[in-house]
Amino acid sequence: MAKKWTSFPHADPSFAYAGPRLKKAWARLHRGDCEPFPAEPATAEAWRLFHAGDFQQAVDAGRNAKNAGINVAVKAQCVYANYLETDAKNRLALFQEAAGWADERRAAAPRDANAHYLYAFALGRYGQGISVAKALAQGFGGKIRDALAKALELAPKHAEAAVAFGAYQSEVIDKVGGIVAGLTYGAKKESALKHFELAMKLFPESPIVHIEYANGLILLFGKARLDDATRLYEQAAAKKPADAMERLDVEHARSELE
C-alpha cells in the first residue's frame, strides 16, 4: 500500500454520498451484494470512500475499521486491481492479498454472506490472472464453488454471488468440457444459465450482471449466442452507474463494443 494508486478517472459528485445520503441510497448501492448498513461509523465511512472511487483510502479505512470493514477493503482492492492496476504482477498480488483478508473475515464471521462471496471474487480474479487451468490445478475451483454456494445459502438474493456462480461454471465448462466439469467441479450449463437469470432478475440495473452473463454465453455457446451477448453488452454500456465501481463496469462494456 506504500505506492500511490492510480486515481479513479471518472470523478463524479453524484458518487459522493455525504452524510445521510449514504444510508438513503444504501439499498440501491448494495442491491448486488446484500451488505447490511454498517453499525460502525468507521465502516460506513470506508464504504463512502469506495462508492466515490477513492479505492486506496477505502482499503485503508476498511482495514482500520476491522470486522465488517474488511469487506470494504477486499472489494475496493479487487475493483481497483481489476480495472485500474496496469502492472500484471501487482494485480495478482493485490487479488491474492485481498483473498487472504476475505478468508480471515469469513473464518471470524461465518454468517457473513458477503465475506464468502468476496473470498470467491478475489480468488476467482486471481485464478483468471494465472489462467483458469492453473487455478483448477491448484484446487481453486472447489474453494470458489463452495464459497459462492455458502454466500447464496446465507443470502439467496445476493445477485453478485449468483452471477459469479454462473461465470465460474461457464469458465470451468469452457476449460475442461461439460462432462469433466460436471463430475469433478459440479459445473453444469443449465445451472450456469439459471444463476445468470437469477442475477438478472435480482439486479437488472447492474452493468456487471449483464457483462458476466454475456461472457458466459460466449463461453458456453460460442458464436451461436454472439448476438445475445452483444445485446447484453449494449445494455450494460447504457446503464446509469450509481457509484464508481458501476462506472468502471459501464466503461468496460463500452470499450468492448468499440
Question: Over which residues does each language-model region extend?
Answer:
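N-terminal alpha-helical interaction modules that lie
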Residues: 1-155, 160, 193-195, 202, ...
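Conserved alpha-helical positions within TPR/SEL1-like repeat arrays
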Residues: 117-118, 163-164, 211-212
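Alpha-helical adaptor scaffolds
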Residues: 157-204
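C-terminal interaction module
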Residues: 210-216, 220, 234
